[in-house]
Amino acid sequence: MTGRRVGAGLLGLALLGLAGCSTTDDGPDPEESGTPSSAAPGRTGTPDPDEDADEDGEGRTDPSGTADPSESADSHGPGTNRPASRRWRPRPGTRWQWQLDGRVDMSVDVPVYDIDGFENSAKTVAGLHARGRKVICYINAGAWEKFRPDQADFPKELLGENNGWAGERWLDIRRLDVLEPLMAARIEMCRKKGFDAVEPDLTEGYRNTTGFPLTAAHQLDFNRMLAKLAHDRGLAVGLKNDLDQIPELVGDFDFAVNEECAQFGECDRLAPFVRRDKAVFHVEYALAPDAFCRDAKRLGLSSMRKRLDLDSWRKPC
């Protein structure tokens, strides 16, 4: 399993959820197929016909808000900086797939894929582009992972408490002088592989027990640094969770990625992104399908049910 995160309260569910999960995309609902609901509940539903306009997944470029119809998903080619005026920006309601575990299933008919940046090659990204998909590069920004190839580049004094996942420790995000070149290298990797955007994970460390006296101000500085590093390379960037800081950060990020806002009654807090015509890519794990799809559509979220291990299985609204 790759190093993706859920809330600390779901760690027990995460461990249980790795058992008994098939990798069949859009397959049977785990509750219907005998998988315990605590393993990885999510949601069912059928695609919204109103979302067909986003089938091709172009979204909008920034800042003009008008997509260039002549630009294919991979027209810039791997390793090429896109001008800021042509940076991809997905629109609300754009359908997506989020797969961080296992070989990427390219058959899912959605315009946006979010996949692990380290574990997937430029060839995989190009293959998705050839199918007309935009591709988001998942990286861990807020924690050190001992299984990544650059793990030795992180000074020991920057490593804090374990974040609840084996082999991972919170980073001291106050040290922008050290972390900026390390994060720049990761985002540059995404650019060279041809990704269209970046999803930096663990961008709300200040609300956790990290081993460092992190504040909201430290988090804002770190998150804005990440956004600038992506934008400087022509990549879009998504804000992961961090609901409390959306009012301050919505202008710095091109879309949002959220886990379980419906579970905790917080989806309305993502409205600033939708109001700015920016997509909110949203998943639920522990709710029944009919518990959040109606509200998700009302709010303009791009919502689906996923298992906690984030294999290819999905149930979109």
Question: Which ranges hold each PLM region?
Answer:
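Intrinsically disordered, low-complexity regulatory segments
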Residues: 12-16
